[in-house]
Amino acid sequence: MSVLARLEATIAARKGADPDSSWTAKLLAKGPEKCAEKFGEEAVEAIIEAVKGDRAKLTSEAADVLYHLLVMLAARDVALAEVLAELERREGISGISEKASR
């Protein structure tokens, strides 16, 4: 099992838990909109570190982005497997062609 799959399982286990028991439970209890907002904040922080060029800080922020993406997906009951299946579907297809097909 990959680290992302284990993280997804941990997030799922916290869904519906007492919001005071963990940051994940607290975030999920606030609803999908708050989860999306937090994902956006973390994405912006990663962008800033990418522009600055600090490798260690970018790595840390990228980890935050992945975590908050999984929380946002869980808030909307979208499994990581669904996202991975979509990536597999797109694999080998030109980005220009794929975008035109939407």
UniProtKB/Swiss-Prot annotation:
GO CC field: cytoplasm
Compartment list: Cytoplasm
GO biological process: L-histidine biosynthetic process
Keywords: Amino-acid biosynthesis, ATP-binding, Cytoplasm, Histidine biosynthesis, Hydrolase, Nucleotide-binding
EC number(s) from the headed UniProt entry: 3.6.1.31
Principal subcellular localization: cytoplasm
Presence of the UniProt keyword RNA-binding in the record: no
Covalent S-S links between cysteines: none
A molecular-function term among this protein's GO annotations: phosphoribosyl-ATP diphosphatase activity
Broadest EC class assigned to this enzyme: hydrolase
Pathway: Amino-acid biosynthesis; L-histidine biosynthesis; L-histidine from 5-phospho-alpha-D-ribose 1-diphosphate: step 2/9
Domain of life, source organism: Bacteria
Swiss-Prot/TrEMBL catalytic activity: 1-(5-phospho-beta-D-ribosyl)-ATP + H2O = 1-(5-phospho-beta-D-ribosyl)-5'-AMP + diphosphate + H(+)
One Pfam family linked to the record: PRA-PH
HAMAP family per UniProt: HisE (MF_01020)
Assigned protein family: Belongs to the PRA-PH family.
Designated name of the protein: Phosphoribosyl-ATP pyrophosphatase
Organism, scientific name: Dinoroseobacter shibae (strain DSM 16493 / NCIMB 14021 / DFL 12)
Record lineage: Bacteria, Pseudomonadati, Pseudomonadota, Alphaproteobacteria, Rhodobacterales
Gene: hisE
